[in-house]
Amino acid sequence: PHECSSAASDVYKRQLAYLSIFDADSVKMMLEGQVELYEELRKELLVQCAFIALDTKTGEILAMIGGRSDYPDEFNRATQALRQPGSVFKPYIYTAAIDNNYPVTTQLLNQPVALYRNNAKGEREKWTPGNYDKSTGGLTTLREGLQKSLNLISVRMVQELVPPRQVKDIAQRMQITTPIRAVDSIALGTSEVKPIEIVASYSTFANKGIYSSPIAITRIEDKYGRIIKEYSIDQKEVLSPETAYMVTNLLQSVVDSGTGGSLRWKYKFRHPAGGKTGTTQNLSDAWFVGFTPNITAGVWYGIDEYSVSLGDGQYGGVAALPAWALFMKNAHNELNISKDKFEVPDGVVEVEIDSDTKQLPTNRTKNLEKEYFLRSNVPQ
């Protein structure tokens, strides 16, 4: 922190002790996951990574990695790298929709739409994005759209429900400070972000709408134990508890039965959790950012040179999620963290609805399912 600069010149004379929150065992657990992943990714590429884990409730940094340990440099990718987040940005679109009172049962057509963007020459060109698996379909709920990370649903959301400016405003309210371009392609996470910012921002969902600024040093002492400076936790409410919970619940669907499902069936992580996979257009970035009620963490893998791909099939759920799973599983076990559930606020209710119509059941209803709603948009 810049506040330390005035004391820096006296470091040697006064033998200052910086008391940090970093947990050595947490860093060791992440490094183990990092090394394991490098062996699986393409060895001929200089694959880099960034990782950061925060206390969900306070923003205290538990562990951080700014690059691969066998190729040291002074560039901390966790705090300095600007990378496209891909689908990791989609929760901000859904947050904007929920904040505008759209229920998660809102249905949009899972069919191609055209966008316009500037090409490398600065010229406007037509662009028709698709879902990562090339699939299309019929009417699709917002929940299914995020669960399956459907690009076409995200694009239709910014064209039909929440315009790019509203999505940008939500991201900024949730403390994303890097420039966000308020254009239709915001739906696919094309504006660069810093890993530390998006991880801290995600913790807001799990912390009932309260954003906590990341903090690495709690206080500075001299050799006699006298406190020279203390750093306090900095928090503010940026979302309502209801909006935060609804997005949390959507992100739980992602890891329970969506694109992050391997967290459960393959890596056996059993704590209540939410998260999102992310992959950029040419597979140059692979992300997984997620949280439990106690720890929020994010993993990024990529090449420093933006144009170089990680290789075929290296999606966020394949390249980044395994390291996240290894760290979170070990951290929760080693720290004996209980399987706390996300608290449902008073303004959110669970309602039984018709599985086909997504409305209240009638005498023609064949199948039922339960869904969460804000009290203000429960089906009538």
Where do the model's predicted regions map?
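Mid-domain, small-residue-enriched loop/turn segments at the edges of structured enzyme/sensor domains
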Residues: 122-129, 161-200, 209, 213-216
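A penicillin-recognizing enzyme superfamily signal
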Residues: 5-55, 64, 70-78, 89, ...
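Second-shell loop/turn segments in exported
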Residues: 37-40, 75-83, 128-133, 141-143, ...
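Proteins synthesized as precursors that undergo proteolytic processing into mature forms
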Residues: 71-72, 83, 98, 104-105, ...
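Short, well-ordered junction/capping motifs at the entry into regular secondary structure
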Residues: 1-2, 188
